[in-house]
Every structure is written in C-alpha cells, then in structure tokens.
C-alpha cells in the first residue's frame, strides 16, 4: 500500500475526532519502490522512492542507533521515549518553481509539513509557526556537479491527540528531484532542543536525495 501525494491545502475548521485518527496513518507522499527494509545498516536508511514524474529517487540519511524505524510504508525514525524523530515527505513542486528548489516559497514547505492529513496537522491546524533560519546550500554529487538544498529551522505549536499545545523545534532539508520536493524533517520537543541540537543537526545534514540513472534498453540490430 502506498501513500497518495501530499495535498498542501490547509484545513480551516476544528480537529478531527480521535476515533477517526486512530484508523488512519499520516500521509507523507512517500511511495517506496521496494518491499524490503530500507535499513542499509543500523542507523542508516538507504531506499528508493517515486518522484512526481515517475522516476526513481535514491534517498539516504543517518540517525542515532537508539532510534527505531517505524513500521509501515513511510520513512520515519524516532526515539519513542523522548519524542525525537526524523521523517521524509514527498510533494509535487509548484508549477512556477520550474524544478528549482531555490524558487519554491518557504511557505510551501510549511503547508506540506502541516497538512491536515499529516503528522502534525492531524489534530488541528498549526497556526503558531515560525521560520527562524533559512538558506540554500549546494552539495556535491558523485558526478562532481552540485545540487541545491533548502535548509530551514522552525518552531511551532502542534496540537496533541488530547488537544494540548506543545512547542516543538525542527530542522528541514529539502531538494528537488523528478518534479518533486523531497522534504526531510528532523525535530524534537522545544525543551530538549539545546540538549540534542548537535544530534539533530547531524541527522539533518546527512540527508541526500538524488535521481537514479536507469540504463536504456539495448537497441536491436
């Protein structure tokens, strides 16, 4: 079973009932291309997902070994005890971005992250949210070329299942491949941010997403 692409519209009304939420899984837009485990080795994910144009995208990231990979179709790792986590979102790029992550407005990433059917928007709209840092970096590809990543730091107040507001901090690393934005989110409760900042930053900076080259079939004589 695969997830449908993430919709970026924001719900205007109130929260969904807890009973309804228990029957659903957060929609991430991730469509994995393999049924095997994405764990390459302990603390390392290596997998392929489908982009908007149908092509395969190789994704990888590292995480602390005490974190666990969540079951199900999503790429989601977490420290269950402390609520630290990292997960991947995939969404079609805005048409006017022309395939460039630099041209995507910052609000787009927040709309995807806080979509009503997502991890943080499921219990109600996330109205209190703030971008504290944002920049574009160029990272080397194996070919020697460069690939742009939008890197952001945010703070926000999502609702919990019992309708309490909790402050969280997150780091976002996003790049564009195959007509999709691949958005990697690493975060924790705000009261833990100073303590685990370096750990989260290592996870955040480890994320890579690159197009997979497919060999053309040999021509017949």
Task: Set out the residue ranges of the language-model regions.
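N-terminal targeting sequences that direct proteins away from the cytosol to non-cytosolic compartments
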Residues: 1-149, 156-167, 176-221
